[in-house]
């Protein structure tokens, strides 16, 4: 399979000048910028990757933007990684302050993205883990008593959705966090 994974590709279009951001952390200036679709089309055309599988990691983007990136006629990306479902255990929206996952919110996010991408011709890259995330069995399941059942449930959940599943190394074995500390 020939293809490329583009890390945080939706932040390649930035303004020439930044103003003070009193409304947040500055993402509105550099996420899904004005020229990002133009740049992606140029990259596909000039990079010799038309017809290859391309997946883009999307930082803080919307469903509508992912549809735009992946709709078949747009010639930008084959599919998108979005991280909204992995933020359901962020306490007060902070990545390093965790709480019990809100499974109902996760279910609603999956439903919204599944229905939205299908209705508008987009395509999801489905995943639980990557190099920036803890192991899904430890995070969203039980890594002790119900380790096997948790691993199977998470695998079935991802593989029965519409999209292309990605399996992070060790995930096929139901790998858990090492709990060093």
Model-assigned labels for residue ranges:
Residues 1-181:
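Active-site and adjacent substrate-binding regions of carbohydrate-active enzymes
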């Amino acid at each position: 399979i020939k293809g490329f994974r583009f890390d945080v590709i939706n932040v390649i279009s930035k303004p020439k000048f930044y103003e003070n951001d009193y409304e947040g952390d500055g993402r509105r200036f550099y996420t899904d910028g004005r020229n990002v679709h133009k740049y992606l089309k140029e990259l596909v055309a000039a990079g010799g990757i038309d017809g290859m599988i391309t997946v883009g990691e999307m930082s803080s983007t919307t469903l509508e933007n992912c549809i735009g990136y992946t709709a078949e006629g747009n010639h930008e990306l084959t599919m998108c990684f979005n991280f909204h479902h992995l933020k359901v255990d962020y306490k007060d929206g902070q990545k390093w302050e965790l709480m019990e996952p809100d499974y109902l919110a996760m279910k609603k996010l999956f439903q919204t993205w599944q229905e939205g991408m299908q209705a508008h011709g987009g395509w999801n890259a489905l995943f639980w883990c990557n190099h920036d995330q803890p192991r899904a069995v430890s995070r969203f399941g039980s890594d002790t008593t119900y380790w096997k059942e948790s691993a199977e449930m998470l695998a079935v959940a991802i593989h029965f959705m519409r999209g292309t599943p990605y399996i992070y190394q060790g995930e096929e074995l139901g790998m858990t966090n090492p709990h060093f500390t």
